[in-house]
């Protein structure tokens, strides 16, 4: 192969030693001469792998406590030397070609994440020689092979075994892309860290000025190209975080069905994040990013049946999320009753898979169990900029709630209030949710005035012949006027949960008292746009 390049000499210098010994042994078995530094060289030598210290190769010792090890012309000339062009210069300067470099970088992210990390700790974990070698090797990918991830060690060895000790241009180019992605992410982390800090009195100390850096750097990996975006004339792709550490649509495994669309992904995310709020068996049905039916049951089948009952019309072509293992009985109820785009659950039983398999186009996803929530950010693109905020993970406990009316909620009402409040958090503002016995009765979403959202919730309930009298109501934000309270009372709502905080709170409370309703304040708003 004319684009194949033989590996005769390799430089190995890694912070994470995972798999490096086996990689070195395999390279040695292929007749590759090994150069290395510091701890990596000691590991190889201690395990009987012949290795040349870089300082012996360059004739220059490591200096400044290891800060300068590989920054030498005999190293970078060997990496950057163009085969067929630079041989004379290399020979004149006693530079030998280095055909492969395996490097991973100082653990900067892990260091700054540790409690008590000082500026000095952070600075000493900024790798200099490593990124320089990575970039040099990736730049000269026409002739040299760069490996920055231990998962690629086997790939390189297998290719060498299949190509008489050589790697192909296709592989070198792909590894070069991974290398540039790696150094970009690394530099981005460093810039983000320093961009939040201001120096203190000591040159070795600093403190956080803001949790948001002055230049924001992040890196996402393309999971899949999408057929189109929100609309058919828009191109789209799905990118995910580098390290996903919680159950999500981004980390879910698709077990069957057509490829996920842009809207499928957005709606599935909304459904899954909502159902995660519940500890009892729960089902959430979403249409156009809004819950149209949510319920708790003694099991998932009952939860699904009750959620569907809220709004069967909107449930058609919807997304269904569960917070427990999907069983065959529940799966049968879904596929026999309605057209569904996506079903997602932490676990899907084999029997449930067999049931859904009869509907080949249904997208069935398994996301894994979730534990505690992890801190993360939300992004909203605006023309010319990006809004960044903490993800809304706030949720009040019953002990946080303040009863503001003369009438106290009953125990049953309080349970429904907490259920209703969790649902309202995931409904587009202005959001009004009616609920009774841990089941949504009506959902009013996205209206420009809060009173109209209340009217929509009432209309939805009436359309499905659901009894509103005795239900509770949740509002994602405060009521600016008493008209929303009057509308709720007219519909038969017995109890209201809302953040409070309006300049007319006293008037709102008086209206609730006038109607004999109970009302509680959470002190926390849940706008969703």
Swiss-Prot record:
Pfam families, A to Z: AICARFT_IMPCHas, MGS
Entry-linked Gene3D superfamilies: 3.40.140.20, Methylglyoxal synthase-like domain
UniProt entry keywords in alphabetical sequence: Hydrolase, Multifunctional enzyme, Purine biosynthesis, Transferase
Record has Hydrolase as a keyword: yes
Disulfide bonds: none
Catalyses which reaction(s): (6R)-10-formyltetrahydrofolate + 5-amino-1-(5-phospho-beta-D-ribosyl)imidazole-4-carboxamide = 5-formamido-1-(5-phospho-D-ribosyl)imidazole-4-carboxamide + (6S)-5,6,7,8-tetrahydrofolate; IMP + H2O = 5-formamido-1-(5-phospho-D-ribosyl)imidazole-4-carboxamide
GO cellular component: cytosol
CDD domains listed in its UniProt record: IMPCH
The protein's name: Bifunctional purine biosynthesis protein PurH
Gene assigned in the entry: purH
